[in-house]
């Protein structure tokens, strides 16, 4: 599986985060480029919770250093923070959202997930509708030789 990175101002600009609580799975804290929590804060998010594996301990947003390897890992944070916005960019973690219910997602008004497989894209499209999101859009990332990688944006 190809691990990708992004420029937040290109890949996540569809998320309107001003005055919102953002739960950022795969926040990129260990990359040398800008981590997405910094960008969300610059865009006016009221609180950002970043989740990743890096060792840095930022003091300007809430950081959880933990792997996301199950539905429960996601739900623990969703229930604790009740985010308005969820962004997930963890290669392979898309599948853990498949068992999450509409009730679990009731606080979430915007959802963005990077997918790395066309079957997972179809699964996420279905889940987004099941969760009650009224609108969604898909954007392919990178170039045509990586056509199975993209982002699904959804909003209520």
Residue ranges and their predicted role:
Residues 27, 53, 66-69, 90, ...:
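Hydrophobic pocket-lining residues within nucleotide cofactor-binding pockets
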Residues 60-62, 81-156:
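Conserved acidic-Pro-Pro-aromatic motif
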Residues 8, 34, 71-72, 95-98, ...:
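Structural motif corresponding to alpha-helix initiation and N-cap regions
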Residues 1-51, 54-80, 85, 117, 124-126, 131-156:
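S-adenosyl-L-methionine
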């Amino acid at each position: 599986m190809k691990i990708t990175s992004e420029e937040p101002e290109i890949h996540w600009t569809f998320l309107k985060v001003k005055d919102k609580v953002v739960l950022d799975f795969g926040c990129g804290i260990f990359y040398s480029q800008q981590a997405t929590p910094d960008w969300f804060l610059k865009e006016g998010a009221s609180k950002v919770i970043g989740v990743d594996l890096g060792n840095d301990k930022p003091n300007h947003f809430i950081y959880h250093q933990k792997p996301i390897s199950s539905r429960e890992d996601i739900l623990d944070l969703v229930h604790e923070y009740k985010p308005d916005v969820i962004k997930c960019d963890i290669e392979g973690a898309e599948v853990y959202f498949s068992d999450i219910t509409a009730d679990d997602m009731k606080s979430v008004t915007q959802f963005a997930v990077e997918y790395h497989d066309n079957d997972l894209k179809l699964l996420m499209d279905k889940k987004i509708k099941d969760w009650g999101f009224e609108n969604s859009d898909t954007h392919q990332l990178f170039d045509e030789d990586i056509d199975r990688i993209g982002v699904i944006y959804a909003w209520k």
